Curated annotation (Swiss-Prot):
PANTHER family: FLAGELLAR HOOK-BASAL BODY COMPLEX PROTEIN FLIE (PTHR34653:SF1), PTHR34653. Keywords: Bacterial flagellum. The keyword Heme does not apply. GO terms for cellular component: bacterial-type flagellum basal body. It is found in: Bacterial flagellum basal body. One of its GO terms (molecular function) is structural molecule activity. This is Flagellar hook-basal body complex protein FliE. GO terms for biological process: bacterial-type flagellum-dependent cell motility. The gene is fliE.
Length: 114
């Protein structure tokens, strides 16, 4: 249960960093991600890869926990499974929206005349 609370705290910290960046409080996205521990290098590619790896890891962990619950493991409770599944879903939806924004920005740039 303590891991879930610290996980929620981590997600909250990332959301606050993104909100600060959106309002102009943080100079760059790399600085916002570095504060949350998501990216160690300052490049966009490394930040994107770290985010995708985290999303994939969350999904794999949630799936493993769900399978453990299904076979009746004593140390896995239903509420932990549900919370981890929702965290994985939210992470995936966030990644999907980031991808959509990147594609939209790319299309806008491609339509600009030089």
């Amino acid at each position: 249960m303590t891991a879930n609370v610290s996980g929620i705290g981590s997600v909250l910290q990332q959301m606050q960093a993104m909100a600060a960046q959106a309002s102009g409080g943080v100079a760059s996205p790399a600085a916002a991600l570095a504060g949350s521990g998501a990216a160690t290098a300052g490049t966009f590619a490394s930040a994107m890869k770290a985010s995708l790896d985290k999303i994939s890891g969350d999904q794999q962990r949630a799936l493993g926990e769900a399978q453990a619950f299904e076979v009746g493991a004593a140390n896995v409770s239903l509420n932990d499974v549900m919370v981890d599944m929702q965290k994985a879903n939210i992470g995936f939806q966030f990644g999907l929206q980031v991808r959509n924004k990147l594609v939209s920005a790319y299309n806008d740039i491609m339509q600009m005349s030089v």
